[in-house]
Amino acid sequence: MNTKKIAVVGPGIVGMPMAALLSVSPATDGSPPPRVVVVQRKSPTSGWKVDAINEGRSPIGGVEPGLDKIVADAVAAGRLSATHDTYACSDADVVLVCVQTDKSGLAPEYGPLMEALDGVALALRKRPPGTRPLVIIESTLAPSTMHSVIAPFFAKYGLIDGRDVMLGNSPNRVMPGRLVERVAQSDKLVAGLHPETPVLVAAA
């Protein structure tokens, strides 16, 4: 897959190390690393992360070996940036959605995730037909959620899985204090509703 731009929605403990590593990792065919843009919604509690990243600083607290240097080097090289504007997703080849999902009682709480996907879907509607960007949900989802919730949500915006977008799920497990190590070295489970999607997710 010829990936030139990746958008990472949510610079938390999953999204930030993924964005940093992707921005310095050459493709398997030897082509340069993709340009990576981190998308963080403007909010009183998290909006500051955009300025921090654009200044070359990781917004993740605590000691995370290697992360600060990777972020600083990638920003200095012009391969990593951050924005509040979800429309940065509109020309991305791959969109990684790394928004935390919690529980409300025994049921999963998808409010923040769906809010993020609303912005992603609005942005992707601007793309030319047939470009089929890959949208990978890195959040933890209950079984069948891609089929019963995510795909119908995108369809409401006229984005049909397999035709207009390729929807995939690849939940990430991380460990504070070892974020870079876990993201770089852990095996990944990849899934999608369309038969092509797992192959594309694995290659992204």
Q: Which residues are covered by each model-predicted region?
A:
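Short acidic low-complexity segments
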Residues: A76-D91
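Internal alpha-helical scaffold of NAD(P)-dependent oxidoreductase catalytic cores
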Residues: P152-N169, V174, L179-A204
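N-terminal glycine-rich dinucleotide-binding loop that anchors FAD/FMN and/or NAD(P) in oxidoreductases
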Residues: A52-L80
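Rossmann-like NAD(P)(H) cofactor-binding subdomain of soluble oxidoreductases
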Residues: K103-V174
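Glycine-rich, N-terminal phosphate-binding loop of Rossmann-like dinucleotide-binding domains
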Residues: V97-V99, S139, L193
